[in-house]
Amino acid sequence: KMSSLVLDSDEGGWVVSVVIVNGLQKTFRGPVVLATGHSARDVYCYLFSAGIDMEAKGIAVGVRLEHPSLLIDQIQYHNKQGRGKYLPAAEYSFVTQVEGRGVYSFCMCPGGFVIPAATDKEQIVVNGMSPCNRGTQWSNSGMVVEIRPEDINGEDVLKVMRFQEQTERDCWIN
């Protein structure tokens, strides 16, 4: 796990080595790819404070909808009895544009669960998952809308990330 980057200020801030958690320093020739994963806010704050050039990027924000699996099966298979014993749990996908902005379902989990996914205390963040048999009585899907950097006031390059974090905390409080 990376603990810090060593930058060469004479070369325009290029990464010349990476310090890992146990204190070892690894020197690199060529580009360094940071595969941060989800909720790596500390990494982005570190890079920003180190003077790395960054720009704000859009995200998708929404809610997770939960439905009886039978209802989705009935709608998708056009059958009052649902899927029967031979068809798989039904899925759906919703995609549209509203005034040029994407609105869509995300990570539809047939016969699945809504699960907690917060990475910090006092946050509400959820995701969905389906067991391999997709056999629970509930299905769920994220329903999200595109949020663009220009939707959020200010010039802070990390403003979209800060908006996301504040939204997760607001959901906890309310």
Question: Where are the language model's segments positioned?
Answer:
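Residues forming the flavin
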Residues: 1-174
